[in-house]
Amino acid sequence: KTGEPFRSLMSELEHSAMLASWMSANMPTMRSLLVDTSIFYEGGISETQDLAFSISIALEYMRAMTQNGLSLEKALKQISFKIPIGTNVFHTIAKLRALRIMWARIVENCGAPANLNPALLDASISKRVLSGRDVSVNMLRASCACFSAVAGGADTVTLFPHTQIVSAPSSSDRRIIRNIQNVLKHESFIANVADPAGGSFYVENLTDIFAQKSWEIFQLIESKGGFSKQLLAGSIYEMVEKAWKVRKNNLDTRRDSVTGVSSFPDLYENLEKIEAVVEKKLKSQNKTGLGFNDLALD
């Protein structure tokens, strides 16, 4: 979270490329490299920044693999994406659709057909949108995230039990979170439609806006040497830190409201366990004070 790698970043990329080459030769149906921007998203970055980071990291992987002797077609088959999502339904739908558009453009600019290898997306609900207070509301958040992920074209969806922020989930908690997906699949039939949001002017327009703004951030990162160089230089950390300050202020001033925390809180809820979790978090992050966001975020 400080932007400092545990080991040489270039060495890690080289080893990742070697692993991908071995996987391509010995287990061609498996994907070895996962683009996961969860740590940045939980740090407070916006949807467009998250898209730009994802594409930039994927391009770093692709360059490392091709430089290691892997063909472009085989390199593309080694990459998959884990995209953190929130509870804003339309933003999530547009975000996932925009990522596919941007990735297709990257593939095409690299000299391959745009439809050679569509992005494989795992949409995972971010812990930053889960609340430690009134945890039952997390079931609604998970439902929104799951619906929007499927409507946005995710290949797989990852959800967390609603109690995970404050305690170890019980078997009942895990069953509830599984059934959210089952209900959406078997009762709404949303999975039977290829592109549920296709044709909606609002969604199409929002997708274009996300793609355009994300592409501009991506181009800025690339113009300065790529994601790895910017990470080592501290620029990525600065972007995350700036985004976090904006998000924290919006949460603390209720510009961004959190149901059950800053809006409609349960004033009679037993907060002892929650306060213990928050205190542990504050100590680990060297923070002082207790804002609405500290109760809302993991």
Question: Model features per residue range: what roles?
Answer:
Residues 175-298:
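Catalytic-core signal marking the mid-to-C-terminal active-site face
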Residues 25-29, 63-76, 102-117, 147-155, ...:
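Secondary-structure transition/capping motifs at alpha-helix termini
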Residues 29-59, 151-198, 204-214:
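Mobile "lid/hinge" segments at catalytic clefts and subdomain interfaces of large enzymes
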Residues 2-21, 135-138, 217-231:
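Phosphate/diphosphate-binding loops
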Residues 50-122, 127-129, 136-137:
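Gly/Pro-rich turn-and-neighbor structural signature
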